From Swiss-Prot:
NAD keyword on record: no
GO biological process per UniProt: menaquinone biosynthetic process; methylation
Gene source species: Corynebacterium kroppenstedtii (strain DSM 44385 / JCM 11950 / CIP 105744 / CCUG 35717)
Gene Ontology terms, MF aspect: demethylmenaquinone methyltransferase activity
Reported function: Methyltransferase required for the conversion of demethylmenaquinol (DMKH2) to menaquinol (MKH2).
Family from the record: Belongs to the class I-like SAM-binding methyltransferase superfamily. MenG/UbiE family.
Keyword check for Nucleotide-binding: no
Protein name listed in UniProt: Demethylmenaquinone methyltransferase
Native organism taxonomy: Bacteria, Bacillati, Actinomycetota, Actinomycetes, Mycobacteriales
Length: 229
């Protein structure tokens, strides 16, 4: 199938994820060497959901991140606009709903906290997506964004870039049901802003107390923020 482009047209992105849903989790584990499990645990720790809190997990895909967050005892709802991904996650005992990140199917001030892992990069309008997340989070509520970022060690950065553009698509051909989608993945990661720039975007979207923590040498960064009271 035709892969999505960096124009990030919603229908193209949704079709792309629909196509990779069945093998998405397996492919990610292979491509990351299993580190994706540690990233999910770090995201849960950073967000720090409490028992009884309502949390929305955006770009939840197959619900693997939703299941991890649910270990906290919070009521976690996964939301994604790819029906194929949601279908692939039906076996998980977590609530999953269909919804567009730019027009979420939730009322204002519904959630105590929100998280989005490896999904903000796919929004056509990053700032608009962050404002929409703020709409559904209660005043004083928390946000954690887990996303690919910029390695902080120059030599490591060079090796990582080579992996993205050469090795990643090659490995994807072996394990993925739609390897072309991983060409988009590599391109979108390279085009994504670095840690400091993303922090400014989050702040400009109305969030406060914005900060970040690097994981795996900056391959991934966890940005956190709070909605003003």
């Amino acid at each position: 199938m035709a892969r999505a482009t960096l124009e990030k047209k919603p229908r193209e992105v949704a079709r792309m994820f629909d196509a990779v849903g069945k093998k998405y989790d397996l492919t990610n584990t292979v491509l990351t060497g299993g580190i994706d499990t540690l990233w999910r645990k770090a995201t849960r720790k950073r967000l720090d959901p409490k028992p009884g809190e309502k949390v929305v997990d955006l770009a939840a895909g197959t619900g693997v991140s939703t299941a991890e967050l649910s270990k906290s005892g919070a009521l976690v709802v996964g939301c994604d606009f790819s029906l194929g991904m949601l279908k692939a996650g039906r076996h998980r005992n977590v609530p999953l709903v269909a919804g567009d990140g730019l027009n979420l199917p939730f009322a204002d001030n519904t959630f105590d906290a929100a998280t989005i892992s490896f999904g903000l990069r796919n929004f056509g309008d990053t700032a608009a997506g962050l404002r929409e997340i703020a709409r559904v989070v209660k005043p004083g509520g928390r946000l954690t964004v887990c996303e690919f970022s910029t390695p902080v060690i120059p030599v490591f950065s060079t090796i990582y870039t080579e992996y993205l553009m050469r090795a990643l698509p090659t490995v994807a051909k072996i394990v993925s049901s739609d390897p072309e989608s991983y060409v988009y993945l590599a391109e979108s990661i390279r085009a994504w802003p670095d840690q400091e720039t993303l922090a400014r975007i989050i702040q400009s979207a109305g969030w406060k107390e914005v900060g970040w923590r690097n994981l795996t040498g900056g391959i991934v960064a966890l940005h956190s923020a709070t909605k003003p009271r």
